[in-house]
Amino acid sequence: SRLPSRMLSRSPGWLRRSAPAAVALLAGLATYAAFPPVNLWWSALIGVGVFMLLIRGRRFWAGTGLGLLYGFGLFTPLLHFTMVGMGNPIGWIALTLFESLYLAVLGGAWSLVSRLPLLQGTARQSRFTRRVPAGAAGVLFFALLWSGIEELRSVWPLGGFPFGRLAFA
């Protein structure tokens, strides 16, 4: 965990285990706030940045689970209009779950990629990577993963569902 050790020793076990889940949900909500009707564009920077830092270096299944929760925090309010249009919550819940699965894949992938030696600054440096700090390389790799997942979400399945791309915020 990333909290100071004296804080962890005083906090109950359930709080230590549930804090990352709450942070993932709140990061998703912060990202949602960048979209209309809230339109706080800068909250996307906070939400996505917290998501990236929260999952960095975690185990695969932890990253996957936190990605799923981040997706719930983002897509539950963002796709609420589908319940209004359908008159029942079934489509809203199904679409929220399906779209959140993409971010679960992103969370799992980022948890693996973020542990690469190149991104931790421990890899043997080539002529190209010598000039790129490990932190900047991490942001670049995360942006590539995020863009890839958004593109996949936009084209698959059945022509995709591009609603909720970060560029729309």
Segment roles from a protein language model:
Residues 6-169:
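Membrane-embedded alpha-helical bundles of multi-pass enzymes
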Residues 1-5:
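Extreme N-terminal basic, low-complexity initiation segments
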